[in-house]
Curated annotation (Swiss-Prot):
GO terms for biological process: cell wall organization; peptidoglycan biosynthetic process; regulation of cell shape. Its EC number is 5.1.1.3. It holds the Pfam family Asp_Glu_race. It comes from the Bacteria. Provides the (R)-glutamate required for cell wall biosynthesis. It comes from Escherichia coli O157:H7. SUPFAM superfamilies: Aspartate/glutamate racemase. One of its GO terms (molecular function) is glutamate racemase activity. This is Glutamate racemase. It is an enzyme of class 5 (isomerase). The gene is murI. Belongs to the aspartate/glutamate racemases family. Substrate binds at D28, S29, Y60, G61, N93, T94, T205, H206.
Amino acid sequence: MATKLQDGNTPCLAATPSEPRPTVLVFDSGVGGLSVYDEIRHLLPDLHYIYAFDNVAFPYGEKSEAFIVERVVAIVTAVQERYPLALAVVACNTASTVSLPALREKFDFPVVGVVPAIKPAARLTANGIVGLLATRGTVKRSYTHELIARFANECQIEMLGSAEMVELAEAKLHGEDVSLDALKRILRPWLRMKEPPDTVVLGCTHFPLLQEELLQVLPEGTRLVDSGAAIARRTAWLLEHEAPDAKSADANIAFCMAMTPEAEQLLPVLQRYGFETLEKLAVLG
């Protein structure tokens, strides 16, 4: 069946119906959350997946906390009204650090967040120097510093905040080449260190999409650590033990907040990830 772009007022034409499966929402401001979704799908292939990305307010890294909380709650509410959810994953470090309490208070299904994988990185490092590569918002937030104090207080933590890397990851998914020179410029503070980090935390869900390019630029032997696999395991446990019985037989679907030409260009990418349709989601507020 041909895949169609859908407007928010147009009924979605589902693919051939299947057995009802638990409905899981994966949400991000952009397409970086696809890296987390891919880990979850690898572990749990037989779920009904919804991917929602906020291409109206992207990127979140420079937005205020109050704006992010209100926006994320509104989007998850809009999805829940269309498809009752068994579980939601906020696959955005910036949104997770500020919006999880509000989401968990409002909804009765489990909500999983993404936090920088500082704890495993502190265990893996051999030279005691850990790099945290994230958005500027994540680097600045007190939550991140609390994680470091709790799990990596014996390590030297070198933090780099970059909005440009988010844009590079988005461009890669649109089919553009990633400039290694741009990555070298972003990573210059580490590359100039006499002893750079031997373990780097990818503290934004966009950054695993750049793993291949990062390994070409960082010193040989550098370990890259992200939280995708841990999120997948947590999702599996919650679905088994705490999630409500919210299922759908529909095909996987992706939602954007505005049907722009750039969003339409993502359709082939979303298809490769298993999403049958891309539809504009009507969000109040």
